[in-house]
């Protein structure tokens, strides 16, 4: 009987020990914090003018901190001011031409054409009468063939002149053709587009910062003749500051976008930065050599982009960091 009790007690103790060990192991697994390794990734942008010209001035130097919209440099705007004035004059000319066509002809011009028609009617009447007299004389053999032909030519020319004047009067009375007005409207639209481009070109002689950041490089100096898109400054953006890290396939399930993490640097081992996972690459790759990690280099990993929410000036491009996932 005592032996059975001892066996039962031993079994119970063994079960309790197994349960305790399992619970301890489970807690250790739950409490284990996933640690990743990566580098600070601060985006840079090359800044330049959209138009060409002579560089007149630069307002900042390497290391300067700049704000969005701050003036960084200017080109000599003389040629662009002249181009703008020419474009404005072209628009005014096109507007005047269109207004003239839409207004039609003045009463004075119409009266002048009416008078011209009357004069040419009289000229035609005289030429026609003269031809008829010459034809009568020719029938009586009282004039030469040359005189008759000259009279006929004069009558035909007078008739053509009269018809031209009548056509001109009809045009003046009906106004300009719709096709002419449409062409004038198209010319005005083209002139206005050229004016808008001239205004934009003049505006682009001033280089503005697109965002806040720090000037990394100043590539040229005043007096340089620049082509459009030549780099003038390289700017390190203040925001966003990212960390590029890598996670193995085994831990990929823990790397969910929006997951909060702590980011440690060698200079602040006890004061982490905070961030969230913003992107997980859908494709695997071999661990880059630039990443300090205890994992095997041959392991396939997935790239993460971690957005630092409380970044400061201590974070520099390429700085190695340690990323630890925050336990809920």
Curated annotation (Swiss-Prot):
It is found in: Periplasm. The keyword Nucleotide-binding does not apply. Gene3D superfamilies: 2.40.30.170, 2.40.50.100, Helix hairpin bin (1.10.287.470). InterPro entries: CusB_D23, UPF0194_membrane_YbhG, UPF0194_transport. Pfam families: HlyD_D23 (PF16576). Residues 80-109, 139-208 form a coiled coil. The keyword Coiled coil applies. This is UPF0194 membrane protein YE2891.
């Amino acid at each position: 009987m005592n032996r059975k009790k001892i066996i039962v007690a031993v079994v119970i103790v063994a079960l309790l020990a197994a349960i305790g060990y399992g619970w301890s192991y489970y807690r250790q697994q739950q409490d284990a914090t996933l640690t990743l390794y990566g580098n600070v990734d601060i985006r840079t942008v090359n800044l330049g003018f959209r138009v060409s010209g002579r560089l007149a001035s630069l307002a900042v130097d390497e290391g300067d901190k700049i704000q969005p919209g701050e003036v960084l440099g200017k080109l000599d705007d003389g040629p662009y001011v002249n181009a703008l004035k020419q474009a404005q004059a072209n628009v005014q000319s096109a507007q005047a031409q269109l207004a003239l066509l839409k207004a039609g002809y003045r009463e004075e011009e119409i009266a002048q054409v009416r008078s011209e028609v009357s004069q040419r009617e009289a000229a035609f009447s005289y030429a026609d009468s003269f031809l008829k007299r010459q034809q009568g004389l020719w029938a009586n053999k009282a004039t030469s063939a040359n005189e008759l032909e000259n009279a006929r030519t004069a009558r035909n020319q007078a008739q053509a002149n009269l018809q031209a004047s009548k056509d001109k009067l009809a045009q003046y009375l009906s106004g300009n053709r719709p096709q002419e007005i449409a062409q004038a409207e198209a010319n005005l639209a083209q002139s206005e587009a050229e004016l808008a481009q001239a205004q934009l070109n003049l505006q682009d002689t001033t280089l503005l910062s697109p965002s806040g950041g720090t000037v990394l490089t100043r590539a040229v100096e005043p007096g340089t003749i620049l082509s459009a898109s030549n780099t003038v400054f390289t700017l390190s953006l203040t925001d966003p500051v990212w960390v590029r890290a890598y996670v193995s396939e085994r831990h990929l399930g823990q790397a969910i976008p929006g997951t909060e993490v702590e980011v440690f640097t060698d200079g602040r081992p006890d004061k982490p930065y905070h961030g969230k996972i913003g992107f997980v690459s859908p494709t695997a790759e071999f661990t880059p050599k630039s990443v300090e990690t205890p994992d095997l280099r041959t392991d396939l990993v997935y790239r993460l982009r971690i957005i630092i929410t409380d970044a400061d000036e201590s974070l520099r491009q390429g700085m190695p960091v340690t990323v630890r996932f925050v336990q809920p």
